[in-house]
């Protein structure tokens, strides 16, 4: 086996994998090896895999919305996590210990794409990106004999009479955002954000079935379990969809729902905006486009 001398960008890559959980070739190259060719990046990745630092998997099934090669996905191994811990003093949180189904990989990669786009939006405003809670993150007190879904930090059960309803967002974050990005003197506010990655596979009834859980989560402020000091923060539920047509369908389905005012919709393409926080890419149920962070004057970018 060839010995590899780890460079700072290698540690950056391993740390990023341990933070977001999964990356594809495109994002791994762009974020960790942008100064070298794709071929050189692939050669380096091969060494990482041979050394047992990362795990690669080419999906047998790909539901991509664009033609092209089936992506290879990368996750951090326990050995890779050990290397990061020894080098930085911080052990990565998200290490894959099993092989999820292809559809789970698809879903988690879409969550990561959303996260990275919004993190870039925070950096564009000279703000540190908030921490995320991802769908696979486990409760500290989770028991091994519990069903996997119930071990998740974002699993919220609520009693409604003799029935238990649940809410399981795909991701969550507590955002501390400017009241006005152009006027620092206006200060900051908190926003609790939940995310739903919509793959256009759920029918109307399946979509609507999510909302008793969201209603209970918002009414009972279930996020205080992990965002304990955000007692008065407003809530938004952000749907990230594959197409505008799908957004139109969801808007029609949800426009009269009691939670309509907290819903926002954008496409994956919308998230390629350079400024996904201050650009009006998020549609409400009426179709009006809104921003997450208000800006009353042009920003110097």
Predicted feature locations:
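Nuclease-adjacent, charged terminal/linker segments that flank catalytic cores
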Residues: 1-102, 301
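Structural beta-sheet core signal
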Residues: 173, 194, 237-239
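Extended serine/threonine-enriched, polar tracts that run as long, contiguous segments within proteins
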Residues: 174-176, 196-201, 216-219
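Non-catalytic C-terminal interaction segments of nucleic acid-processing enzymes
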Residues: 5, 201-209, 219-301
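Amphipathic alpha-helical dimerization/coiled-coil segments
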Residues: 82-132, 190
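Active-site metal-binding core of divalent-cation-utilizing nuclease and nuclease-like domains
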Residues: 64, 117, 123-191, 203-213
């Amino acid at each position: 086996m060839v010995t590899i001398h780890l460079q700072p960008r290698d540690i950056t890559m391993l740390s990023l994998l341990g933070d977001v959980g999964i990356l594809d070739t495109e994002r791994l190259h762009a974020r960790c090896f942008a100064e070298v060719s794709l071929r050189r990046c692939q050669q380096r990745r091969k060494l990482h895999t041979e050394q047992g630092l990362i795990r690669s998997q080419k999906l047998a099934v790909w539901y991509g919305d664009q033609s092209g090669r089936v992506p290879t996905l990368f996750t951090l191994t326990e050995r890779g996590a050990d290397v990061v811990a020894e080098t930085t003093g911080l052990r990565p949180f998200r290490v894959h210990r099993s092989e999820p189904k292809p559809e789970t990989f698809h879903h988690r990669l879409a969550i990561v794409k959303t996260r990275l786009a919004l993190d870039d939006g925070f950096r564009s405003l000279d703000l540190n990106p908030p921490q995320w809670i991802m769908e696979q993150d486990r409760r500290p007190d989770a028991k091994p004999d519990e069903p996997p879904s119930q071990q998740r930090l974002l699993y919220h059960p609520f009693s409604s009479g003799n029935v238990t309803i649940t809410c399981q967002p795909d991701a969550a974050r507590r955002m501390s955002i400017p009241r006005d990005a152009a006027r620092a003197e206006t200060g900051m506010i908190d926003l609790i954000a939940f995310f739903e990655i919509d793959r256009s596979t759920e029918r109307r009834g399946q979509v609507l079935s999510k909302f008793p859980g969201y209603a209970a989560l918002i009414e009972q402020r279930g996020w205080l379990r992990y965002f304990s000091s955000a007692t008065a923060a407003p809530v938004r539920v952000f749907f990230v969809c594959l197409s505008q047509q799908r957004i139109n369908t969801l808007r029609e389905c949800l426009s009269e729902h009691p939670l309509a005012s907290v819903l926002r919709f954008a496409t994956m393409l919308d998230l390629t905006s350079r400024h996904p926080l201050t650009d009006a890419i998020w549609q409400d149920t009426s179709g009006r486009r809104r921003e997450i962070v208000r800006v009353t004057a042009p920003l110097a970018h």
